[in-house]
Amino acid sequence: MSLLCVGVKKAKFDGAQEKFNTYVTLKVQNVKSTTIAVRGSQPSWEQDFMFEINRLDLGLTVEVWNKGLIWDTMVGTVWIPLRTIRQSNEEGPGEWLTLDSQAIMADSEICGTKDPTFHRILLDAHFELPLDIPEEEARYWAKKLEQLNAMRDQDEYSFQDQQDKPLPVPSSQCCNWNYFGWGEQNDDPDSAVDDRDSDYRSETSNSIPPPYYTTSQPNASVHQYSVRPPPLGSRESYSDSMHSYEEFSEPRALSPTGSSRYASSGELSQGSSQLSEDFDPDEHSLQGSELDDERDRDSYHSCHSSVSYHKDSPRWDQDDEDLEDLEDLEDEELPEEEEELEEEGEEELEEEDLEEEEEVPDDLASYTQQEDTTVAEPKEFKRISFPTAAPQKDDKVSAVPTEAPEVAKGIPKAATPEEKAAAERAQEAEPPKSEESFRSREEEEGQEGQDAMSRAKANWLRAFNKVRMQLQEARGEGDMSKSLWFKGGPGGGLIIIDSMPDIRKRKPIPLVSDLAMSLVQSRKAGITSALASSTLNNEELKNHVYKKTLQALIYPISCTTPHNFEVWTATTPTYCYECEGLLWGIARQGMRCTECGVKCHEKCQDLLNADCLQRAAEKSSKHGAEDRTQNIIMVLKDRMKIRERNKPEIFELIQEIFAVTKSAHTQQMKAVKQSVLDGTSKWSAKISITVVCAQGLQAKDKTGSSDPYVTVQVGKTKKRTKTIYGNLNPVWEENFHFECHNSSDRIKVRVWDEDDDIKSRVKQRFKRESDDFLGQTIIEVRTLSGEMDVWYNLDKRTDKSAVSGAIRLHISVEIKGEEKVAPYHVQYTCLHENLFHFVTDVQNNGVVKIPDAKGDDAWKVYYDETAQEIVDEFAMRYGVESIYQAMTHFACLSSKYMCPGVPAVMSTLLANINAYYAHTTASTNVSASDRFAASNFGKERFVKLLDQLHNSLRIDLSMYRNNFPASSPERLQDLKSTVDLLTSITFFRMKVQELQSPPRASQVVKDCVKACLNSTYEYIFNNCHELYGREYQTDPAKKGEVPPEEQGPSIKNLDFWSKLITLIVSIIEEDKNSYTPCLNQFPQELNVGKISAEVMWSLFAQDMKYAMEEHDKHRLCKSADYMNLHFKVKWLYNEYVAELPTFKDRVPEYPAWFEPFVIQWLDENEEVSRDFLHGALERDKKDGFQQTSEHALFSCSVVDVFSQLNQSFEIIKKLECPDPQIVGHYMRRFAKTISNVLLQYADIVSKDFASYCSKEKEKVPCILMNNTQQLRVQLEKMFEAMGGKELDAEASGTLKELQVKLNNVLDELSHVFATSFQPHIEECVRQMGDILSQVKGTGNVPASACSSVAQDADNVLQPIMDLLDSNLTLFAKICEKTVLKRVLKELWKLVMNTMEKTIVLPPLTDQTMIGTLLRKHGKGLEKGRVKLPSHSDGTQMIFNAAKELGQLSKLKDHMVREEAKSLTPKQCAVVELALDTIKQYFHAGGVGLKKTFLEKSPDLQSLRYALSLYTQATDLLIKTFVQTQSAQGSGVEDPVGEVSVHVELFTHPGTGEQKVTVKVVAANDLKWQTSGIFRPFIEVNIVGPQLSDKKRKFATKSKNNSWAPKYNESFQFSLSADAGPECYELQVCVKDYCFAREDRTVGLAVLQLRELAQRGSAACWLPLGRRIHMDDTGLTVLRILSQRSNDEVAKEFVKLKSDTRSAEEGGAAPAP
């Protein structure tokens, strides 16, 4: 991707001024940009546009359009090929291009233009160049260019030519060979954006590294801009060089710091503090003076060294000879031993398996930790791998280039597991590109064979794929997870289900904290010392720093003599030494030092900080006052002697730090003292100052702007820049040179606003400063060394000054005698690092000694008193800022960040560093990132340090249980501080670096905690048996060795899971009680205890689910074992997981795992319950069904049965299943168990119940009925306990159905029990009948006779009352209320029915036999009841019985004999009164049956209705019969023939008299057999009220032997005018005429006249039935009428309705 910058400047058009209103459009790669519209023939736009270009074979289309009223017209166009556009980092003056009028098209794309116009446009287009490649790399490319130029015999090209050539497009780094560790020399280890911290990068750079480097340079405040021009060379050659290098690059031996051959570590030039040690030139590195020589060479701005080419790039088809030459050249450069090692490495990689531990050489380990930040996967964690110790937040895998060198220092190195993992992730991120790129490169090699490098790449790919497969297997990605469950184990015996498992929490065991893990960590904690302590081995630098330290400490600034100022009066115009302003006033104008004579304003005296003694000595020596000088020198000598005598420990410590011998130290002390005495008299330096630019200046002009310029003064020499008009962010780029001979001088840089108005001219007359002051910065010369590029904040001069902004200066100082030394900041770094190394590693065995300091500035105290004084005095002497000191100490501590107490110190340090940069003051508006960029420590260096520290902290937090054991309060405090440090790093990235969305510290820690928990779970899972035995096994007998195959999960037992739950609980408890209070910085976002529970449960749930599925297939354990495990899992979930936000509103899965086993247990439980039921009933039977207690009316079998059921239900209930669906399944199954058990109980009781009733023991049947009722009561309670209305619908239905069945059983038992009293009741009622028959009197009873009626009623009731009284009293005592009411109901029915049948409606004639027959037909005595509203089969049954016995005909004779027992009205009154008494008795004052029930009882109503019928007239009874019996002839299923009749109904209009005319037409299909002649005739009867005086019957003539006779005879009946047709009916009867005997009935039919009431007439076929159908009401009317022997109409009616088809005789067959 390249950045194309296009500036549209102006244009010149041929035409009138007013004709044009134009705008410009730019099109490239489907992107279009447009300028504003400008009027005139010479418009000026001055607009810049930027495009991202990834194809250089296209072009930029520029079109100029003229705006119109309706549409726009094109003025002209020009097409610029992208290849022709120059590369530059600066804007050019632009180029005038002629516009053409037409575009040339090819394949629908513009490829040029034609037909020029007279219009022209000024455009400036250039590609941006990459910035800041390391100087070393620049020299390398320059060297390559020279070699290629020599090979091709080409001379230098001009720089302009070079600019005009296109820059090849660099490919994305996501697709280069750094994935596989090749071409690592192309990778810049110091690139901040290309850092390997994937978590950090994934949120800041979208996982795509930028195409160019931004490499840090030594002592750089901002970037080190090159001040030398780049070397001239062929752009073509340069491109080819890049191409070839990419194609044939080979792995190189790495330097000890891990920096590559050509890409410097970012700190190599200018005596860098990052230089680890001197290099040998043969090993492609720099040493000694060669470094200095190289420093003078030209640097070159190169593009990113991993540039690759597309096939359509301009130089793709270059001749191959260049490439071959380069290949030969590079082969020569590769040492032989490296080639051999390459081959060895290939073999090793092919044979290598993924091992548990790998030994890495120290230097390589150092390299790996510094440069390759891929995280070493802890060996004991086999389930998970976390590349940066924290899982990615999204599914994208960051494409992080991973360096994997094959050789270092001649030692072969195989790929470490970390690198394999990184390679795997990279391969997963972009496998297609990598393979395609690899294939394309292989094709380029040709068919002859591959060179060594290509073979190495192929081997790498093979090894990588192999490792990738192994990693997949190791992670269990194959189908191997289920094999876990096929391991054997001891079987468990039957145990009682423990619904409250005792998961022991007696102590939070440090399972993984203090116990040795299965493998040791391969990575040492701490950032590599190569980064933090780069100066330890630089002896030359150390020697120089040693001298400078002595110099700073022998006469420290803190001991300098202050000026002795006094008020002074100037006699001549005098100027302030500090601000150079005139000392105004007549007298006492300023201050003057009595010792050295310096004069200044009163306000400026504090700005003069030079040592008065040294200043006096300098002044005296210059003016020849030797005596005075000698005095001062003596004072200085004395002071240094006193210093040395009073503070000997300081100089001894300095000697020990730099390991200087005693004699050498003594000599050096003398030399240092002499240099101090010499002061500045022999000191001189050349200072070069470049005023680069300024930002954020104050606006002083009325226009809201300023015209700034800068004055620079060193000593008395003052220079100024040019003025930049109207700009608050001016750029000057002006260089000034000074010579300085006084180290106490200061550089005064002041910014002014130039004014050229009258006011300023007047001001100039009176003041030396006519311009407005914009700010200043004062720089001590003695603090300068080497080269510096620094932003300085502009300071005020007085309190009234309005100042803002900052100025950037590039300062180069060459001090005489110190031309080649490092800058003072680098020297300070050397001092600090060596001091830290000495105090920590030498004196304290690697443990950081933390000083005891308090107060606001405690963070600035890094060592104890002596060492702290050394660094402070050095910093003060040489101008090292306190923030630089802090950053340096932070870098030192980062190498020991795992030492006790260090994280807290680092956290405080970084917090103060953050505050320094992020908290801007009112005096400056420079952003935090700009302030940080101006840091002398080096922006990139510090960012990289933080990135690597961040990465390492994440790794260690991902093993917090190891690194910060809960048993150590000190380490827990370190853990807390470590998180604080992470938070400070995040704050730094957000506020100082100003990154958009750095990873939140809380999220990072959360990911680390999860990673640690993952590995902890894996560890306890794999070592469950051993850990449990060690911590919890108290029984020595159980501590025996268990075979390895039985230590894991088994399908034969469940012990493993119980132990695992115990261990999980201990882990969660440890996190909850130890780590949660410690990591409390993010209360809303991070709770370690909750995360622990969540992760542990998630992993446990996954394994448990698979295990239970496996167990479900085999079922080798007892159901009780599964239930016990279920309770433990339930407890674990409820105790730790249920309230977690993730699971709170979710139905957990664990009940589903155990559902089949719970159902199995319920199945088994039903069998147990049934066996228990039989046992309980047998015991109860033996005991005689005794009451369980005095107050309980039921026996113990009910209690036993429900105790067992309740226990079973309690177990189900205690499962507390949170899944409603599964609860429903359990309830359904348990409801079936309840139903089966209780119904079995009821069946057993029902079978034997009758036998208990037959004995003269009323108590046992009552107890059994009470038991049944108690079943119903307990069932209702259980229904409520199971959920009541909320219970599953199916289970609820089962229990309700069971309740109905038990109710029916109770009804049946009550009926059976009551029926056992029937013989006694019948006997009593017969006695009542006999007493009633003796009651005399007819007609209605007068009021005066009421008392006699009551007396008669009492007499009549006497027998039944005696029976009821004796029994009901007993029942009330031994029956439950519900049972008692049921028994009373049955007895009530029995009494009522018996009275009705025996007294009110006695049976016809042969009562006993008819009663017996009725019972035989299954209807019992109750069939005689009157049921007014309903129809039943009672009538038919009676007639059937009568027919079978031939007794119905006796009904016809009934009235002839005097056997009928017809009740008189008085007797009816007595019966009525007796009924009321019986009713009151059964009500029993509310204890018995309810009055409403008794009143509405159908039995009572039937009896009363029968009594009421006794008092009704015959006509009324006949009318009732006709109106109620509407189905006498209907429903004839088996007709015996049919009769055709025509009926007409006529009403006289005057009298209202009604007549019915009946025409008998014919009969048909008569079914009759007779031995004689068949003579059918038809008889028609009219039935109804008030017909006693009218003719009621007609008959036709008979027909001989005709089964379908025709009659056509008409008859007329007269009806009463008082009753309507609905009260009458016609009964048609077909008979066989017999001469000598009674006619035989063939069939009967009834036609009710109500059907003709509307129509008036009807012709119809009437089917003939065998008898008349009637209900109980009809039968009752018939029986009452049958007792009226003196009533002809009644007798005739009874005979008519009781007639049935006669018996047939065998004879002739019916006619067809």
From Swiss-Prot:
Residues 1102-1245 form the MHD1 domain. Its main location: cytoplasm. It comes from the Eukaryota. Its cofactor is Ca(2+). Plays a role in vesicle maturation during exocytosis as a target of the diacylglycerol second messenger pathway. Involved in neurotransmitter release by acting in synaptic vesicle priming prior to vesicle fusion and participates in the activity-dependent refilling of readily releasable vesicle pool (RRP). Essential for synaptic vesicle maturation in most excitatory/glutamatergic but not inhibitory/GABA-mediated synapses. Facilitates neuronal dense core vesicles fusion as well as controls the location and efficiency of their synaptic release. This is Protein unc-13 homolog A. The keyword Glycoprotein does not apply. Interacts with the N-termini of STX1A and/or STX1B1 and DOC2A. Interacts with BSN. Interacts with RIMS1 which recruits UNC13A to the active zone. Forms homodimers via its first C2 domain. Also interacts via this domain with the zinc finger domain of RIMS2. Part of a complex consisting of ERC2, RIMS1 and UNC13A. Also part of a complex consisting of UNC13A, RIMS2 and RAB3A. Interacts with FBXO45 (via SRY domain); leading to the degradation of UNC13A by the proteasome. It is found in: Cytoplasm; Cell membrane; Presynaptic cell membrane; Presynaptic active zone. One of its GO terms (molecular function) is calcium ion binding. Disruption phenotype: Mice display normal synapse formation but abnormal synaptic vesicle maturation and die shortly after birth. Heterozygotes exhibit impaired insulin secretion and abnormal glucose tolerance. Gene3D superfamilies: 1.10.357.50, 1.20.58.1100, 3.30.60.20, C2 domain. Residues 321-360 form a coiled coil. A zinc finger (Phorbol-ester/DAG-type) spans 562-612. Residues 203-224 have a biased composition (Polar residues). Zn(2+) 2 binds at C593, C596, C612. Keywords: Calcium, Cell membrane, Cell projection, Coiled coil, Cytoplasm, Differentiation, Exocytosis, Membrane, Metal-binding, Phosphoprotein, Repeat, Synapse, Zinc, Zinc-finger. The modification Phosphoserine is found at S239, S241, S244, S255. Ca(2+) 1 binds at D701, D707, D753, D755. It holds the Pfam family C1_1. Residues 1-97, 668-792, 1535-1662 form the C2 domain. Residues 318-362 have a biased composition (Acidic residues). Zn(2+) 1 binds at C576, C579, C604. Ca(2+) 2 binds at D701, D753, D755, D772. It comes from Mus musculus. Residues 185-454 are annotated as: Disordered.
